[in-house]
UniProtKB/Swiss-Prot annotation:
One of its GO terms (biological process) is tRNA modification. Its EC number is 1.14.-.-. InterPro entries: Rhodanese-like_dom (IPR001763), Rhodanese-like_dom_sf (IPR036873), TrhO (IPR020936), TRHO_N (IPR040503). It comes from Rickettsia akari (strain Hartford). Signal peptide: none annotated. Belongs to the TrhO family. The gene is trhO. HAMAP family: TrhO. This is tRNA uridine(34) hydroxylase. Keywords: Oxidoreductase, tRNA processing.
Length: 247
């Protein structure tokens, strides 16, 4: 039986002074280790998802951590029968997840994590609203039953939605959700920076939630859109046929 392909996703908000200098080093080790996927680098940190053998994706992650020196890294691994990526790309970006808000400090302002095992209980409490920070085409594939969708085409539209919906958010305990954790973490940072106090987010995102809970309480409906060749995954994180969506 052939070895399963490991898919490792990792991000960290950490100051990187010269991110462009890291590109050739990461490309070199990634190609040597037959790893495929995408790593985004910016002054605010890194965000990557790449596939290969379990040993090799972890070696690439170790190099990434060594080069950037973060205090905390959000990491998750799941498995596939085939590579979900075609090749390795390392790209320089202005932001590792583009929101277009100048001066946002995610280390200084961010919400409180809710562990996947505690998520169902938390979001069914009084005065809690769930905001799905993903784009409309992702939400159409699947979301939490109680979630509110901002109906954005891109994450850059999210700050404007927040500005227009202050009445909806005022006085609420706001629970943010996204695919792997990075967008909801940055979303909580935005809300905290403009004065919202009770802001929370699902640790590890929807993918970690499905892995840890298997959607046992059926609060999640549909499949989870992913940005690789699988396109969408079911409760058990297996690819879902028929969700070859355009984006």
């Amino acid at each position: 039986m052939s070895e399963k392909i490991a898919i490792l996703s990792a991000y960290s908000f950490v100051n990187i002074e010269e991110p462009a200098n890291l590109i050739p080093k990461l490309l070199l080790i990634g190609k040597r280790k037959y790893v495929r996927g995408t790593i985004l680098l910016a002054n605010e940190g890194f965000n990557g998802s790449f596939s290969g053998s379990y040993e090799n994706v972890n070696l690439v992650l170790e190099e990434l951590i060594k080069l950037t020196g973060p205090k905390d890294v959000n990491v998750k691994i799941n498995y596939s029968d085939v590579h979900p990526f075609q090749k390795l790309k390392v790209r320089l970006k202005k932001e590792i997840v583009a929101m277009n808000v100048e001066g946002l400090n995610v280390d200084l302002f961010k919400g409180e994590y809710i562990e996947p095992k505690d998520w169902d209980e938390f979001i069914t409490k009084q005065n809690v609203i769930v905001i799905d920070t993903r784009n409309d085409y992702e939400v159409e594939v699947g979301t939490f039953k109680s979630a509110i969708s901002p109906n954005t085409k891109t994450f850059k539209q999210f700050p404007a939605w927040v500005q227009k919906n202050q009445g909806l958010l005022k006085g609420k305990r706001i629970a943010m959700v996204c695919t792997g954790g990075i967008r909801c973490e940055k979303s909580t940072s935005l809300l905290k920076s403009i004065g919202y106090d009770e802001v929370y987010h699902l640790k590890g995102g929807i993918l970690q939630y499905l892995e840890d809970t298997q959607n046992k309480n059926n609060l999640w409906q549909g499949a989870c859109f992913v940005f690789d060749d699988r396109r969408a995954v079911a409760d058990d994180l297996s690819p879902v046929a028929g969700h070859w969506l355009q984006r």
